[in-house]
Amino acid sequence: MTKYALVGDVGGTNARLALCDIASGEISQAKTYSGLDYPSLEAVVRVYLDEHSVNVEDGCIAIACPITGDWVAMTNHTWAFSIAEMKKNLGFSHLEIINDFTAVSMAIPMLKKEHLIQFGGGEPVDGKPIAVYGAGTGLGVAHLVHVDKRWISLPGEGGHVDFAPNSEEEAMILEILRAEIGHVSAERVLSGPGLVNLYRAIVKSDNRLPENLRPKDITERALADSCIDCRRALSLFCVIMGRFGGDLALTMGTFGGVYIAGGIVPRFLEFFKASGFRGGFEDKGRFKDYVHGIPVYLIVHDNPGLLGSGAHLRQTLGHIL
């Protein structure tokens, strides 16, 4: 008889839950719930389990916030809870709450070739470190290493490192944003809101007044080639995305590959392919040759967070991935 575990991927807006076959890692019965409709994460889990008439003893839920102890307070939501108390209330034997990019990194060993699009470089080197990052509401970063038949995710808040301009234009953008918001992290330019920041700074650098645009508006106008400022912002986004990925590659020697996740890049895939992304990735001066062969992949799996939550839990329970 198939034994299932509960897996989840929770962001500031929605909670996506599913079942994971503990033996195979296969994900099924995925369903998305609006976080605004429920008073707590526990309430959502109970509704899901009732709807699917399934008894589970184990669970792993990825959440878009730092996980530093038993108490979890979501960054972009009002939900807050004790992991131990939630585990007890649900009657689970195991309940893991992990960072969302920990989950994405743990999905990488489970991905197949059809789940990836490669952007330059050669073949990944087995046993070498891996980096994963992605732009969405924010900028998530994690690394992954393989030690003694176990995958170990190294989470962090790499999206909040300093934005490092590498041209006169970018230096001007930094100056404008710094005057507005103070500290300018990489996330302030590599995210949905970051794309808006780039657009606004580009327009203001020319002493003009920017329109009140959403990330979606900027992308659509850039792809339609109907707004030169929007197109420049999206082009710059791709280049900076490349340089940031190259920074991750240098920091950990990620000859196992660099992986891009998140919901933004797939929305303009053809534009991204033709952009200066790879040039930005390899623009490392004396260390260009060092990163030249490192492959970069875009993850196109529908639910890497759920897949990785399942992989993390299965490994915790003693399975070899």
Swiss-Prot record:
Binding site for ATP: 8-13
Location(s) in or outside the cell: Cytoplasm
Pfam family, one: Glucokinase
Record bears the keyword Hydrolase: no
GO cellular component annotations of the record: cytosol
Chemical reaction(s) catalysed: D-glucose + ATP = D-glucose 6-phosphate + ADP + H(+)
GO MF: ATP binding; D-glucose binding; glucokinase activity
Main location: cytoplasm
UniProt superkingdom: Bacteria
Sorted UniProt keywords: ATP-binding, Cytoplasm, Glycolysis, Kinase, Nucleotide-binding, Transferase
Gene: glk
Keyword Kinase: yes
Gene3D superfamilies the UniProt entry points to: 3.30.420.40, 3.40.367.20
Organism: Salmonella schwarzengrund (strain CVM19633)
Protein family membership: Belongs to the bacterial glucokinase family.
Name of the molecule in the record: Glucokinase
Enzyme Commission designation: 2.7.1.2
